[in-house]
Amino acid sequence: MEHVVIVDPEGQRVGTEEKIRAHADGGTLHLAFCVFVFNPRGELLLQRRADSKYHFSGLWSNTCCGHPRPGEGVTEAAERRLGEEFGFVTRLHPVAQFTYHAEDHHTGLAEYEYAHVLIGRAPTDQPAPDPLEIGAWEWAAPLRIQADTQQYPLRYTPWFRRLIQEQPVADWATG
């Protein structure tokens, strides 16, 4: 049984809870991360979440997301998860933090997360995605993604839409 780290509104660890339970009944505030990996052309590696994911399945999103395990650091967890989902590792650097709440009306589950945003550079243009996690992937320019999320918002996860509209993602690509 997987557990997530429960946090207070300032992101301080206060306990643990079973993963699915933390996403039920409107969600419990827990620790998470969102990874953005760019290639040398400044394009972002996007993923379409696999149809088998327990919530927000089939939607396009940032490179990967996840939860640190109890006792695991955020950067360590993000680098681990990137390897699990895309088959490569790279050094990740924190650039932002945000709290968000989003309900998946198809499953009745919710995300209520204190999330760290980390960025990195891809060591390859040809990742090896895990098909149980990732239904499709592509490289895309941040400005194209920003326009697409405005025109077709329901194609994207709610946290990714918020980040792509509110954060300087194009600057992260060149930073």
UniProtKB/Swiss-Prot annotation:
Gene responsible for this protein: idi
Binding site for Mn(2+): H23, H30, H67, E111, E113
Subcellular location: Cytoplasm
GO biological process entries: dimethylallyl diphosphate biosynthetic process; isopentenyl diphosphate biosynthetic process
Pathway: Isoprenoid biosynthesis; dimethylallyl diphosphate biosynthesis; dimethylallyl diphosphate from isopentenyl diphosphate: step 1/1
Function: Catalyzes the 1,3-allylic rearrangement of the homoallylic substrate isopentenyl (IPP) to its highly electrophilic allylic isomer, dimethylallyl diphosphate (DMAPP).
Cofactor: binding details: Binds 1 Mg(2+) ion per subunit. The magnesium ion binds only when substrate is bound.
Keywords from the UniProt entry: Cytoplasm, Isomerase, Isoprene biosynthesis, Magnesium, Manganese, Metal-binding
Protein name: Isopentenyl-diphosphate Delta-isomerase
Gene3D superfamilies reported in the protein's UniProt record: Nucleoside Triphosphate Pyrophosphohydrolase
Catalytic center residues: C65, E113
Taxonomic path: Bacteria, Pseudomonadati, Pseudomonadota, Gammaproteobacteria, Chromatiales
Source species, domain of life: Bacteria
